[in-house]
From Swiss-Prot:
Transmembrane segments annotated in the record for this chain: none
Domain of life: Bacteria
Pathways per UniProt: Carbohydrate degradation; 2-deoxy-D-ribose 1-phosphate degradation; D-glyceraldehyde 3-phosphate and acetaldehyde from 2-deoxy-alpha-D-ribose 1-phosphate: step 1/2
Molecular function terms from GO: magnesium ion binding; manganese ion binding; phosphopentomutase activity
Enzyme class (EC, first level): isomerase
EC number(s) from the headed UniProt entry: 5.4.2.7
Protein name as it appears in the record: Phosphopentomutase
Residues the entry annotates as binding Mn(2+) 2: 306, 311, 359
Gene: deoB
Purpose: Isomerase that catalyzes the conversion of deoxy-ribose 1-phosphate (dRib-1-P) and ribose 1-phosphate (Rib-1-P) to deoxy-ribose 5-phosphate (dRib-5-P) and ribose 5-phosphate (Rib-5-P), respectively.
Keyword list, A-Z: Cytoplasm, Isomerase, Manganese, Metal-binding
PANTHER family the UniProt entry points to: PHOSPHOPENTOMUTASE
Length: 407
């Protein structure tokens, strides 16, 4: 029985890439800077001391980071026994966004440039806004700017509740985000508005990667909170991913846990499992791994590393999340059967010590574990697509156009 389990620690980069200067990210290092802060006692909120990741270290994380940066992460053990194969991978795609990273992991790099709304104020074309107001039967809109998702709620959440005007905002990513109150505006109405926005952006040729519904609750600034009912409307990948090939060519199964299905616009997904929060995502993953049959991929995105701690530049929170993940990692490892492979990776960086609130262009870790996987270094990988090609080879699908089999 062959099964592959792919775990994306969303935004867990391990050091700046060779082309980081194009993105203003030279010197960024999500893992290294978290470890450094922990070693200095600067991340002792809700946790204490050096970054403690013994299970990830056994899978080769510290070695992969050392390969990427040329140095051992502060306070971490570079001499621990390694029981998995490890690599550090460069992104071939032109961006440092979620769809690009995930599609490339599945063998389809994004070699075109996404569209962006680069103006920080009055970010969106008036023609687009007028269409949304008309088709969505809206009294108007708020925002129309670049912003952090949590900051904009404190600024405009109350006015939104009073007026019924949705909050439109964007970031350095190729996104159009809509924040609305779950109760006063309504979740279904928000989702409908996002569908309209997706249609208008696609038909208008804006080439925007994702429309994101950002529902929230609460009654006043300081109390507003985003809920787990986020929904991403992505464009479809430009070619068949390894997920699609497994389903089409081998009659296989692909189980999405978390936001994976949204990222791939449901292409190549046979089952969707929603869960919110690190523990709930882990619980759902364990359940799906236990139930997975032959020719199945269980694919989980652990979004909190990015959304709760990376973008919010919360080093202590990110460290605590990593340590929680590490404590629970043996639960996954013990479910890996004789012919199975477990792959732990990321989709980009989001260094919580970095300026601003955006992603960082970094190498990602590629940690591969299984009874038939030979432990040791797989070196520097030129594209995340090596993961997709490895999975294609493993299941015997037709090869991907990009990437090399690592095993």
């Amino acid at each position: 029985m062959k099964r592959a389990f792919i775990m994306v620690l969303d935004s867990f980069g391990i050091g700046a890439t060779e082309d980081a200067d194009r993105f203003g990210d030279v010197g960024s290092d999500t893992m290294g800077h978290i470890a450094e802060a922990c070693a200095k006692g600067e991340a002792d909120i809700g946790r204490q001391g050096p970054l403690n990741l013994p299970n990830l270290t056994r899978l080769g994380l510290v070695k992969a980071h050392e390969g990427s940066t040329g140095k051992v992460a502060a306070g971490m053990d570079a001499n621990a026994e390694v029981v998995g194969a490890y690599a550090w991978a460069h992104e071939l795609s032109s961006g440092k966004d979620t769809p690009s990273g995930h599609w490339e992991i599945a063998g389809v790099p994004v070699l075109f440039d996404w569209g962006y709304f680069s103006d920080h104020e009055n970010s969106f074309p008036q023609k687009l806004l007028d269409k949304l107001v008309e088709r969505g039967n809206l009294p108007g809109y708020l925002g129309n700017c670049h912003s952090s998702g949590t900051v904009i709620l404190d600024q405009l959440g109350e006015e939104h509740m009073k007026t019924g005007k949705p909050i439109f905002y964007t970031s350095a990513d190729s996104v159009f985000q809509i924040a609305c109150h779950e109760e006063t505006f309504g979740l279904d109405r928000l989702y409908e508005l996002c569908e309209i926005a997706r249609e208008e952006l696609t038909e208008g040729g804006y080439n925007i990667g994702r429309v994101i519904a950002r529902p929230f609750i609460g009654n006043k600034p300081g109390e507003f909170q985003r809920t787990g009912n986020r929904h991403d409307l992505a464009v479809e990948p430009p070619a068949a991913t390894v997920l699609q090939k497994l389903v089409d060519e081998k009659d296989g199964q692909v189980v999405s846990v978390g936001k994976i299905a949204d990222i791939y616009a449901n292409c190549g997904i046979t089952k969707k499992v929603k869960a919110t929060g690190l523990d709930a995502l882990f619980d759902a993953t364990v359940k799906e791994m236990k139930e997975a049959g032959d020719k199945t991929i269980v694919f989980t995105n652990f979004v909190d590393f990015d959304s709760s701690w990376g973008h919010r530049r919360d080093i202590a929170g990110y460290a605590a999340g990593l340590e929680l993940f590490d404590r629970r990692l043996p639960e996954l490892m013990e479910l890996v059967g004789e012919d199975d492979i477990l792959i732990l990776t990321a989709d980009h960086g989001c260094d919580p010590s970095w300026t601003g609130t955006d992603h960082t262009r970094e190498h990602i870790p590629v940690l591969v574990y299984g009874p038939k996987v030979k432990p040791g270094s797989l070196g520097h990988r030129e594209t995340f697509a090596d993961i997709g090609q490895t999975i294609a080879s493993y299941f015997g699908t037709s090869p991907m156009d990009y990437g090399k089999n690592m095993l």
